[in-house]
């Protein structure tokens, strides 16, 4: 299946999709439905909240994640759970050919990266075996319904010797940072 093409800004400055394929999403599990609904809701404010929560350091961390792949320019990269496209943009700026995929149509609509986009569950990808040289994933591992199935799919779409780099949060150990983390991840 051909990925959705980001056809540039549409109404309201959001990307328009051309040649959009039918959804390749499997039947919803309860967690999948909750995760999709949450990200559809927060998509317009996601980048702002991320910048505030990380004091802007998330951009540096995303660049470091792409650099950790250690792949030459021109490599085909899959941005799994691409969201608004920060990792996709970081990879494209380093000369990679990027495709983004996300479960949330709202996040894809807010995606500002000018790369092909596909709405897909990470555990059921529509790409050929060995289609990518590298795969990046940012802040998403905890949201996958079946992490083992997702990692198996990642391995399937990576070429032999392909590389995966994931950016994820960890609980801080010091005072106010720990309190903020607990409030955000356990109450919000």
Model-derived regions, located:
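Class I SAM-dependent methyltransferase SAM/SAH-binding core
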Residues: 76-125
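Short glycine-dipeptide loop
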Residues: 73, 158-163
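Conserved class I S-adenosyl-L-methionine
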Residues: 163-187
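Hydrophobic beta-strand segment of the Class I
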Residues: 46, 135-136
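N-terminal, positively charged/glycine-rich alpha-helical extensions of SAM-dependent methyltransferases
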Residues: 2-45
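A short glycine-rich, Lys/Arg-flanked "PGG" loop and its adjoining helix->strand segment in the class I
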Residues: 148-160
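A short acidic, Gly/Pro-enriched loop at the edge of an enzyme's catalytic core
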Residues: 123-134
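Conserved alpha-helix/loop element of class I SAM-dependent methyltransferases that forms part
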Residues: 45, 54-73
């Amino acid at each position: 299946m051909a990925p959705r093409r980001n056809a540039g800004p549409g109404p309201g400055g959001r990307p328009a999709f051309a040649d959009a394929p039918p959804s390749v999403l499997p039947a919803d599990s309860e967690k999948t439905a909750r995760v999709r609904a949450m990200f559809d809701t927060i998509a317009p404010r996601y980048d702002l909240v991320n910048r505030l929560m990380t004091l802007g350091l998330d951009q540096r961390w995303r660049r470091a994640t792409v650099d950790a792949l250690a792949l030459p320019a021109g490599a085909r990269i899959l941005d799994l759970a691409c969201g608004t496209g920060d990792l996709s943009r970081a990879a494209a700026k380093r000369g990679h050919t990027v495709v983004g995929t996300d479960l949330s149509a709202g996040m894809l609509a807010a995606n500002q990266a000018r790369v092909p986009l596909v709405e897909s569950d990470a555990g059921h990808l529509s790409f050929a075996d060995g289609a990518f040289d590298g795969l990046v994933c940012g802040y998403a591992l905890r949201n996958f319904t079946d992490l083992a199935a997702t990692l198996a799919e990642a391995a399937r779409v990576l070429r032999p010797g392909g590389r995966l780099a994931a950016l994820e949060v960890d609980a801080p150990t010091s005072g106010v940072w720990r309190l903020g983390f607990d409030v955000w991840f356990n109450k919000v």
